């Protein structure tokens, strides 16, 4: 049966313009499509036979839901360009695009799963800010990663890290295929999270203005090889739209960093025992990402990107002794402190920007000594670069006696600073959403 043909304008209360998180098209709210419900309309011309058709309605229920040609109430929305689904939260809240990338085996997927799980635990209780899935279907794989790490039924058993989370693929379930006539385009699926201040937040009265839908894109390291970003597979073009970029750098993969650690004599059990440990150059990934962003953002070669770049130094548990010597402390506490409390007596915390920036300065100093080309590549590309340490699981990994792989008991995972790059980026890019401590020496 042909798709339902309606003429007219759909009116939805919310933002005047909406940005699709899949194809990044910006369009007036009245152009948004609805997804049919009746089985007669199975098979969309752009998405294929397994998807319900999209349409622009003229009839609505008293509750504002569109009505398809068979009289069924519709509940889901879609982009008028790519026809992929758009969560309702993006109709009401502005998007905040963030991109995370890194070399293969850099620990990016572990970091991402650990970060989002910890954000779910702390955002409401610590910062009086909601943090929830804006689209549970799009976030399904990330939720599975979180469960494997932190809600594993085998939590007390020794599990290989390779069995807990699989590497990010270039194609598959994290991509959507859309047909534009004879041209098929593969779009990367974002992870979507809705955030808003809650009662008790210092800016709770500005919840509608400060609220955001975080659109987080995870890029496979292989996507940054030459020829991997083309019209039919625009896998990294969202990076030019991102308000912040996160480059995951694994110091234990860098031979210079390992040589910097007393010729390997201070390597911990993780680095000595992991037979799967790769030694690889990671700066080409950063340089290729920078080149693509310059091209898509139309930046001159001499012009710096004005959006902040965060270099996340992963597997901190393997090299923490180096930074602790520079910082002068081995404090593994989170960088926030109470600043007040709600009417119900719950504490509200503020992010300790001074402490974070102190760790960032010493992290940069360490990288400048061990891997100066990474520092140069980052600071040549972006005007605001921050180096931060993080460990996705903490000090709980052990090499296997037989195969040399790394093992851990999921119950023993104690992440270090995995939320800090995200929280610090929000504080810098979107002031007001994350409460912060008053700066030392600042005047009121």
Where do the language-model regions lie?
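Hydrophobic anchor at the beta1->P-loop junction of P-loop NTPases
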Residues: 98-100
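Conserved lysine of the Walker
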Residues: 108
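Flexible phosphate/Mg2+-sensing switch loops adjacent to catalytic phosphate-binding sites
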Residues: 90-91, 119-168, 435-439
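Long, basic/Gly/Ser/Thr-rich N-terminal segments
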Residues: 1-92
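A conserved segment at the C-terminal end of the G1
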Residues: 111-121
